[in-house]
């Protein structure tokens, strides 16, 4: 079963003014779509791999044939990362988490503000292209960043919040002002979705 581009859970202009309509359209229909197309192309001659989930492929890259390993890493990672990214954004987002996730953030980072600062630093400090992440690792929250389209899944960690800091994610609106894009991100985080992913990751 070939992988498919997921539909966005909101219109392309829904995240304005924080992320502009044109960026969302190009990011979803061109960039993400290309990762899906190239992932399917890499798996084409390998029917034994076509029934595996994205998580199964990415968590065990070493088991893949060397000839397609890099293509699956880059394009499978890109597909996984963006599929998560769209769901943790919402036009009704922002604010702060509540409940179990809020408690875990306060316990691990001291406060929500301290968490935001550390996450923002990880995003701003990622040289070149990549992602900043809040992950669950052995039941614990952790902030990390990955280069290119690498996914925390490749390291055995479960991502629950991610921020794309590739220039294609923000350049049309913010140009080289990555910190402004990072600051705007907090206005559209869907904390209900992040909390749901946190509960699921803890139950693994």
Swiss-Prot record:
Q: Which cofactors are required for activity? A: Mn(2+)
Q: What does the entry's cofactor note say about binding and number?
A: Binds 1 Mn(2+) ion per subunit.
User: Which residues are recorded as modified (Phosphothreonine)?
Assistant: 34, 70
Its top-level enzyme class, in one word, is: oxidoreductase
Q: Which Gene3D superfamilies match?
A: Fe,Mn superoxide dismutase (SOD) domain, Iron/manganese superoxide dismutase, C-terminal domain
Example GO CC term: the record gives: cytoplasm
- Residues annotated as binding Mn(2+) are 27, 82, 164, 168
- Give GO MF terms, alphabetically: metal ion binding; superoxide dismutase activity
Q: What is its EC number?
A: 1.15.1.1
Q: Reaction catalysed by this chain?
A: 2 superoxide + 2 H(+) = H2O2 + O2
Keywords per UniProt: Manganese, Metal-binding, Oxidoreductase, Phosphoprotein
Quaternary context: Homodimer.
Which family does the UniProt entry place this protein in? Belongs to the iron/manganese superoxide dismutase family.
Described purpose of this protein according to its UniProt entry: Destroys superoxide anion radicals which are normally produced within the cells and which are toxic to biological systems.
Designated name of the protein: Superoxide dismutase [Mn]
Task: Give the encoding gene's name.
Answer: sodA
């Amino acid at each position: 079963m070939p992988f498919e581009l997921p539909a966005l859970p909101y219109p392309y202009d829904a995240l304005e003014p924080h992320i502009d309509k044109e960026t969302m359209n190009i990011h979803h229909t061109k960039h993400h779509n290309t990762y899906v197309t190239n992932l399917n192309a890499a798996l084409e001659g390998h029917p034994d791999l076509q029934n595996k989930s994205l998580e199964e492929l990415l968590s065990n890259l070493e088991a893949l044939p060397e000839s397609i390993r890099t293509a699956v890493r880059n394009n499978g990672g890109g597909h996984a990362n963006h599929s998560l990214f769209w769901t943790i954004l919402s036009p009704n987002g922002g604010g702060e988490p509540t409940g179990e996730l809020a408690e875990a953030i306060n316990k691990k980072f001291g406060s929500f503000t301290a968490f935001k600062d550390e996450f923002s630093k990880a995003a701003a400090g990622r040289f070149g292209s990549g992602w900043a992440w809040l992950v669950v690792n052995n039941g614990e929250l952790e902030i990390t960043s990955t280069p290119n389209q690498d996914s925390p899944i490749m390291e055995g960690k479960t991502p629950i919040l991610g921020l794309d800091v590739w220039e294609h994610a923000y350049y049309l609106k913010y140009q080289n002002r990555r910190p402004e894009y990072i600051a705007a991100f907090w206005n559209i985080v869907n904390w209900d979705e992040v909390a749901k992913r946190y509960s699921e990751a803890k139950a693994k």
